[in-house]
Structures are given as C-alpha cells and as structure tokens.
Amino acid sequence: MAKYCDVFTVGGTKVGALFGEAVVINNPELNVRFRYMIKQRGGMLAKGRLLGIQFETLMEDGLYFTIAKKAVDQAMRIRDALLKKGIPLYVDSPTNQLFPILTDEQAEALEDDFDLAVWERVDESHAAMRVCTSWATEDAAVDAFIRAVEAL
C-alpha cells in the first residue's frame, strides 16, 4: 500500500517504541525542505535522530510486523466477538484499532471496566467508540473484554 502514497506515517508506540511516528516520504518533490518546515513549526525534537534509531531497529528483519501482528490478532478477536453480538462497526478496520457502534448504555457498561474513547457520535443514542490494542495487550484482558461484550 505504501507505494500508492506520497507520504504516510508509521506509528511507534503500539509496537513498543518510546514514542513518536516516522514520516515516510515517497514522493521526492514533497521532501524538498520538509525537514526545515517541521523545524520552523515546532515539530522537530532536539536529538530526534536518536529517536529514529528505534524505527530503524523496528524495520530490521520484519520486527515491526512481528510485533504488530499480536496487536492486530488481539483486535480481530475483539472484532469477532462484537460482530457475533450483532454490534456494528463504524469502519471494518484490519488494524489494531476498532470502532464499534455502541448504544450509550452499552458504552457506559463497558466503560466501568475498560478504557474506551468516543470517536464520533453516530446519533442521539449511539457512538462509535475507539477500542485499541497494542503489543502489550494480554490474552486475559481481551478475554475479559469479550466476556463483557457477550454480557451486554
């Protein structure tokens, strides 16, 4: 997919990086003075090249994808449980981020034990909620979330 984009970002924290996102510029015309534009607008970190080392390491030997696979697999388990329960998705995401459309009552019940965020109000009684997994999401946490979804 990257070959079809002029510019895209690669997130780091969901795969265990300290912080940050890598900006990948495929179109050389857009790279002209990009570094200076970031610096002038306050987006360049001091010693930021050191942070780049984490991305260089993550891109070696498919490590990024190996780590990300766990997050995606956990999200797919949750997705399957949501769909089995008849809960629609705002978008059918193949990533570690899910956006189930919950009633306000369902969201309230899940928020008692889980950290959800309202992504967008769908109507007066439904919201698309953001559910996100990471490299550190444990099976027990996903199992508990699935049980809570089944109990809705």
Predicted regions and their residues:
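Short, basic, helix/turn surface patches
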Residues: A2-A17, L116-V122, R147-L152
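Conserved C-terminal alpha-helix-loop-beta "cap" of PLP-dependent enzymes
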Residues: M76, A81-E150
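Active-site C-terminal subdomain of aminotransferase-like
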Residues: M1-T95, I101
